[in-house]
A protein has these predicted regions:
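Phosphate/nucleotide-binding catalytic core
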Residues: 1-208
Length: 208
């Protein structure tokens, strides 16, 4: 987080982060580091499906994002203000706002993305490469096939539905979907129910 904070403030040329959230009440304040994002605790659901279904599953995750927010909303208050039903969404989107994307995309590093994926999830990694400046300029040593630098760069782009690359125990790359829209808690039962709902809807849609 120290490195992330340094780079965000560098990309902002030292200007403070400005937060403006309007809801039932309004909140306006400035902050001089990225740690406001720590107030946006979420339930991050990771789903891995066979590769032949990964693109369809990703698009389905986008489709059910609004119902998931409606189902899981659990963060109406911030600093004593009654804002959105899920106030962590605007909070997180503004907590790492560097305004460095091309005009074509028009999205920040925390966003809903640019729409459905037409061919495969490679489209999203090409967007990462072509339209998002490197935030953590750290060249990781080792075998390029370990995809360390790709994973590091992807980890600094926080789509609400994000493709993730990792290596399995045999060193083979694998893809999974990280669904980030759900709020944390408030109870273990809620977390389990929300996770099962998301996974069940996706798997059900894949069988249609």
């Amino acid at each position: 987080y120290r490195a992330l904070n340094e780079q965000v403030m560098r990309m902002r040329q030292g200007t403070p982060l400005v937060f403006e959230i309007g809801g039932n009440e309004s909140l306006h304040f400035c902050h001089h580091d990225v740690m406001m994002e720590a107030a946006g605790t979420s339930l991050q659901i990771h789903l891995q499906v066979p590769y032949r279904h990964i693109t369809a599953a990703f698009n389905h995750a986008i489709r059910i994002s609004a119902p998931m927010v409606a189902l899981c909303a659990n963060a109406p208050y911030l600093f004593g203000k009654d804002l959105w039903a899920e106030s962590r969404i605007p909070l997180f989107e503004q907590a790492i706002n560097v305004n460095q994307l091309s005009h074509r995309l028009g999205e920040g590093r925390v966003s809903f993305g640019t729409g459905y994926t037409r061919e495969n999830l490679l489209d999203l990694f090409q967007e990462n490469r072509d339209h998002y400046p490197i935030m953590l300029p750290i060249c990781q040593p080792g075998d390029p096939q370990q995809l360390t630098n790709l994973m590091l760069h992807n980890g600094t782009i926080w789509r609400w539905n994000r493709p993730l690359v990792s290596l399995d125990t045999s060193g083979k790359p694998q893809l999974r979907i990280e669904h980030r829209v759900a709020s944390a808690g408030p109870t273990l039962e809620d977390i389990i129910a929300n996770t099962v709902f998301f996974s069940g809807v996706i798997m059900g849609m894949l069988t249609q």
